[in-house]
Amino acid sequence: MSTSQGRIVQITGAVVDVEFDGTLPDILNALETTNDDKTLTLEVAQHLGENTVRTIAMDATEGLQRGTVVTDTGGPIMVPVGPGTLGRIMSVTGQPIDEAGDVPHTMKAPIHRPAPSFDEQATEAEVLPTGIKVVDLLCPYAKGGKIGLFGGAGVGKTVLIQELINNIAKLFGGYSVFAGVGERTREGNDLYWEMIESGVNKDPKEHDGSTEGSRCALVFGQMNEPPGARARVALSGLAQAEYFRDEEGKDVLFFVDNIFRFTQAGSELSALLGRIPSAVGYQPTLATDMGALQERITSTTKGSITSVQAVYVPADDMTDPAPATTFAHLDATTVLNRAISEKGIYPAVDPLDSTSRILEPRIVGEEHYGTARRVQEILQRYKALQDIIAILGMDELSEEDKLTVARARKVERFLSQPFDVAEIFTGSPGIQVPVADTVKGFKAICDGEYDHLPEAAFYMVGTIEDAVKKAEKLAAEAA
C-alpha cells in the first residue's frame, strides 16, 4: 500500500487540488484527509502538471483548509461486500449511516473494475414475472436484463420501483441491492422501514445489532450530498451486487433510483473540472460514463444481475441526451406518461411507448404475443380516432369503430391496478396478477366476451373475474 503524502493547494466546491512532492497517485485512486475529525475521501480525476492532481470530494468540503495533509491509499475507493452488508444502509464509501455500528465484512471490493469479458456473459432469455398486468403483458422483463422506468416529475417512478421491490424481492428470495442516487432522503427512510415491516430486512435494534436474515443492502447518496457522492454511489451499490453474483453465484436484483441523478452529478463535476460542455450542458463524456456503469450490469455464467432503473425525464422530453443515452443500454423500457396519470390510471404506463426485447413468440409464447399485439392495435386505433371524436363526436363513427373505442376504453382501464405500496393513498389492498390470468383477461376483452359490462367495472381491479364481480356490484348499487 502506497503512503505517499501531499497537501491541499486549492478548494473549489466539490473539487480539491492536491500537490505531491514525490510520485503522483493514479487516476481514480482514493486519497484520504481529515475534516472536522472525520475522514474525507477524495478521488483523483485529473493530473494537472507541476506535481498537482485534481480530485473529487466524496463529502462536504466546508472546513477544509489549504495545506492540510492528504494521504494516497494506493488504490480506488473500496467498499465492504458480503452477507454483512444485507439489511444495512451505507454511504458511497461504505460507511454505515443507519446508526447500527460498523458493517461486518471479511473483504472489500473496488468500486471501479472492468466489465465481464465476452466469454463470461450469459445470453439465455427468461421472463421475470412482476405481478403487474401492464408490464407482464406489454413490456415483460427479462431475468438478468436491464429495465428502465422513464417518466417526468411526479408520474409514479418511485412508487412503481417500490412495488417491483415489494413483488419481486418478496417472491424472489434472492439478494437485492438498492442504490439511492440523488433522490429524497424521506423516500429512502420510507423504503428502509417498509423493507423491515415486510420481512425483507431485519431491524438491528430488535436483534442486538445484527441484521442476519436480511435480503437487501442499501447504499444512499441523497439529493443534499455533494456531486462526488452522487456520481459514485451507483458504482458502490454495483460493487456489492457483483460480489453476490461472482463470489456466491447468486441471481441478484439491483435497483437504482434515479439513474438521471448519476448523469446530473457527472455534469456538475464536469463543469468544476473545467471540461467544455456538450449538448444541453451535459458532460462531453456522457456516453462513456453511462457505458462504464451499464456494461458491468450483466449476467455471467456464474450468476445474474437483473437491474431496474428509474430514469427521470427532464421536462418530459424523451430526446434529452440523458434519457436518450440510457435507452441504448436497456432490454425493456417502461414509459410513464403524464396524460395517462391525469386520467387517474395508475400505474401510468404508456402501453404504446413501452417496449421489451423479449416480447416475441419464441420466449413468451404465441398466445401472449398475439394478445399483446392485439391490445396495442386496439389502443393505436383508438388514438387515431380521438381527433375525429373530439371534432365530430362518437355518433359519426362507424359501428366497427364504436366497438373498437368501447373495447379500447375497457382495455385502458383494465391496465390499471391497485398497488401494495399505494394502499395508504388509495385505500384498496394491492393485487398481484399471474401472467396467465393477465393474458386470459385481455384476450377475452379483445374477443368481445365482456362487451356487455360497463367500462367502470374494469378500473382498478386485478383479474377479469374481479371485473365481473365489480360489474355485478355496480349493477346492484344502481338498481
From Swiss-Prot:
CDD domains: ATP-synt_F1_beta_C, ATP-synt_F1_beta_N, F1-ATPase_beta_CD
Keywords: ATP synthesis, ATP-binding, Cell inner membrane, Cell membrane, CF(1), Hydrogen ion transport, Ion transport, Membrane, Nucleotide-binding, Translocase, Transport
Record's subcellular location: Cell inner membrane
EC identifiers of the protein: 7.1.2.2
Catalytic activity: ATP + H2O + 4 H(+)(in) = ADP + phosphate + 5 H(+)(out)
Record GO cellular component, one term: proton-transporting ATP synthase complex
Binding locations of ATP: 151-158
Family: Belongs to the ATPase alpha/beta chains family.
HAMAP family assigned: ATP_synth_beta_bact
Subunit structure and binding partners: F-type ATPases have 2 components, CF(1) - the catalytic core - and CF(0) - the membrane proton channel. CF(1) has five subunits: alpha(3), beta(3), gamma(1), delta(1), epsilon(1). CF(0) has three main subunits: a(1), b(2) and c(9-12). The alpha and beta chains form an alternating ring which encloses part of the gamma chain. CF(1) is attached to CF(0) by a central stalk formed by the gamma and epsilon chains, while a peripheral stalk is formed by the delta and b chains.
Protein name: ATP synthase subunit beta
Species lineage: Bacteria, Pseudomonadati, Pseudomonadota, Alphaproteobacteria, Maricaulales
